[in-house]
């Protein structure tokens, strides 16, 4: 399937749209026209981690590995629109006699400087179910970076769309959230009338939280909680002084920072560990790709990027050298469509 995209003055045909193509991503990228991809989201094979059935990751040295990745990124820069983004998730490597190698950061620094890319964020994926190890001399690694590069400072970025697709705030609401503040009123130095008014306002914010109108809230009560740090004068300090309490309402979503907490995915009856699940990518796609846009994953693996794109009404293109992974990705995509 191909799609005709009509930019300012010419018609562009994009091959391989909504398909997983078995082959070398460097060669396949050459088949794509310039400036046709809205964003790239991918996770290449890690350095000397396991046999992925591909050439990348099996290099003798880290420099050779970074060179292999950079060769592909150069093609990605060509095919990505001027407003597009490139996001790479890369894992690190411990060497027995040399410790942690900082491979992701060496790669990021190399392509940033060599290709003159604009580094937007280093999004840290916090794995809630990291792989355990028996080593007694270091902590379990539970984070991996997603490097968000843009071709220039005029990149597409829709934070509002991202926040709208987050999990419904009204789900899993605690029935006891905020009730402790009512109990704390008895420990405060508030007058009877102040306590009565405070309890009314606390019940009001609890109700807003339970209905999903707030992500979270905090309350400070005079005589119970410490005043504003440093003793700054301002609205909240004045509220504490004059009415005996202040309420901090937190609107929006939790993931406004550069940390995403999410479990690692896996698939039964395969030797492929989905280093990131589709539900994780669904939290990133709306930020960097408009609806009906095109997401490219040059190391598609088990198809997580494609599934996330499908679910969010985006087109995808996937390249994968390992034929077994292609079959797995196709199976998952068809199952997701049914």
Task: Explain the meaning of each model-derived region.
Residues 2-328, 334-336:
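Core catalytic lobe of class I
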């Amino acid at each position: 399937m191909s799609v005709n995209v009509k930019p300012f003055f010419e018609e562009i045909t994009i091959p391989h749209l909504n398909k997983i193509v078995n082959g070398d991503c460097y060669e396949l990228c050459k088949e794509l026209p310039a400036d046709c991809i809205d964003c790239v989201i991918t996770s290449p094979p890690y350095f000397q981690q396991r046999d992925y059935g591909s050439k990348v990751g099996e290099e003798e040295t880290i420099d050779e590995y970074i060179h292999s990745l950079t060769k592909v990124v150069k093609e990605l820069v060509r095919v990505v629109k001027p407003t597009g983004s490139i996001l790479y998730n890369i894992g690190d490597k411990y060497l027995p006699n040399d410790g942690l190698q900082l491979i992701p950061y060496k790669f990021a620094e190399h392509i940033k400087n060599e290709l003159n890319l604009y580094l937007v964020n280093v999004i840290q994926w916090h794995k809630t179910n990291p792989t355990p190890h028996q080593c007694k001399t270091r902590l379990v690694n539970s984070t991996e970076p997603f490097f968000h590069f843009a071709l220039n400072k005029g990149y597409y970025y829709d934070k509002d769309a991202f926040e709208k697709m987050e999990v419904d705030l009204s789900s899993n609401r605690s029935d006891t959230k905020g009730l402790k503040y009512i109990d704390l009123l008895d420990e405060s130095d508030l007058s009877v009338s102040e306590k009565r008014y405070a309890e009314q306002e606390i019940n009001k914010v609890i109700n807003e939280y339970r209905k999903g109108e707030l992500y979270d809230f905090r309350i400070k009560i005079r005589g119970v909680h410490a005043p504003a740090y440093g003793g700054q004068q301002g609205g909240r300090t004045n509220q504490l002084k004059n009415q005996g309490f202040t309420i901090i309402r937190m609107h929006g979503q939790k993931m406004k920072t550069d940390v995403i907490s999410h479990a690692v995915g896996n698939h039964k009856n395969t030797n492929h560990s989905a280093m990131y699940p589709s539900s994780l990518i669904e939290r990133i796609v709306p930020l960097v790709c408009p609806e009906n846009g095109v997401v490219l994953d040059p190391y598609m693996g088990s198809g997580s990027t494609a599934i996330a794109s499908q679910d969010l009404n985006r087109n995808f293109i996937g390249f994968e050298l390992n034929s077994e992974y292609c079959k797995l990705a196709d199976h998952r995509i068809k199952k997701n469509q049914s």
